[in-house]
């Protein structure tokens, strides 16, 4: 294609993107079409990948086509396995795309569609995609080392130890809650349970087919997996309608918890090519396929966003959660813009699969862009609902009341009309008894998704079908995070125990694999069990910490990335990682202060404790007081640990930049790849 024509095409993309963003940002008092959000996202991501990621790849990271990756040099058939870049992309996307991009934007929609949309677009292109890309490349150049090992080697022993304690604690909590979401989504749902269960033997079949039967035949394996998944989804509907079959797949929460714990252990212990990679690749079919279908549904339906650009709740008095746009919108929407958990995957399983350095761009930067588009779709799904419906679903009973008429009247008085009859009709349409007080974001996303699909594919008669498909989709979306997160946690435990007894640190020694897998699964499994059995909250009480914890992880990752960029002699490019780091520090530290010390009991943990102390001395109140104090303690400890890492990092930067310390990176020796003569992929 001639250079002038390419220039004109990209200029048109840029102008179209500016027009879309301007339309989103400047319209006040009138509704806009959801297509503008899709256009703005597509143009922003296209420009970001084409120009910004290319700049980072060439100038900051200097990707080398001749350098062998650890997947090639350390290949062992278990953890280090050279893998097709699209399979790696699928695994990475499936691993990073968890509850965040689905739930966060739905909850943040209480501010209106504008704040969340702008944060998702800017945060992803300049923050999240950059973090995933650079951490992945730096781990690849260090034999697939974990984030904690890189922190120890590049920042210092103290920073590395603190990073380890902070990260492993957050991983355990994150995995427990991810598992709890899956349990809540699948309990008493034979369709979802059947479909999710069938993805396991399908993944095993794909892994064996690609490894033993038809090595390298990715397209054949993809077609096989896609057909089988579609059959599993169709079979799930049949299973739910057959009393004899549904009996075996209608499971209680404790039963599901046990099964998920067993599955988590197996996923961590078996070779990555047998279950983890093919299952994540398989899940990516459903994830990307559903998101693409949702995008097509939006294009076909061209729905109107009924939620205004900004609502009255920007003042912090929102019913879904309390707090102003800054900092709470940026904490609530984590994974869709930037997520510290991604850095764990980028320095965990993924760098052990990448075949070429140049593939880190599409895997690291590209997969995060895909996840960010998921967040845009979630925003649309929430905002196409009538605001009254949205707030009826997402507002807790303690705010709007438990009786349908009371809740409807309260929400209508806010200026968002809704009636009890409308909510009853909607609940019947999706096959639920009630949709009031279905907090957490996931039910609202499912209702919005069913609304779009039923208006563009199949009509109103299949609304319930699409709603339950969305519930299954959310469970599948989240379960892959459990797979990869458990494996990352296992690697971290092996790193630590290797200092106690060297064989325990060997990722290829099977007794070490089994014992460390059992330890990490037991840790998050304990909290999962508490959450399932404890009606007063259990692990649910830690939900307010997740947004803060996730962004604190990103802060640690960007500290490591900035340190390495400086030591590479690329200090002039340090704003690439330093600017998002400074922003995250301002957001997370401000949010943490408010969550601990804010005098509003709906925001501050300690203020809520004081309020409960004035109430009746019941066991429920005593448990809630304990949970609030625990939340405040955990928040304070995490902030202090991250502050120490920031201090250690800053001191290291100053030593290197002033010449008091020689700049030396801890990269593995250069080895020429055997793929050097192949055409660059």
Segments predicted by a language model, with ranges:
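Loop-to-transmembrane helix boundary motifs in multi-pass membrane proteins
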Residues: 154-172, 364-376, 439-441, 460-470, ...
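Membrane-interface "cap" regions at the ends of multi-pass membrane proteins
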Residues: 1-14, 47-102, 284, 323-328
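Membrane-interface loop-to-helix entry segments
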Residues: 35-42, 47-60, 166, 190-233, ...
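Transmembrane helix-loop junctions in multi-pass membrane proteins
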Residues: 18-31, 102, 114, 172-188, ...
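Extracellular/periplasmic helix-exit of transmembrane alpha-helices
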Residues: 298-314, 369-447, 484, 529-534
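Extracellular loop-to-transmembrane helix junctions
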Residues: 31-50, 108-138, 148, 191-199, ...
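Membrane-interface helix-loop-helix modules in multi-pass membrane proteins
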Residues: 22-28, 33, 79-142, 153-157, ...
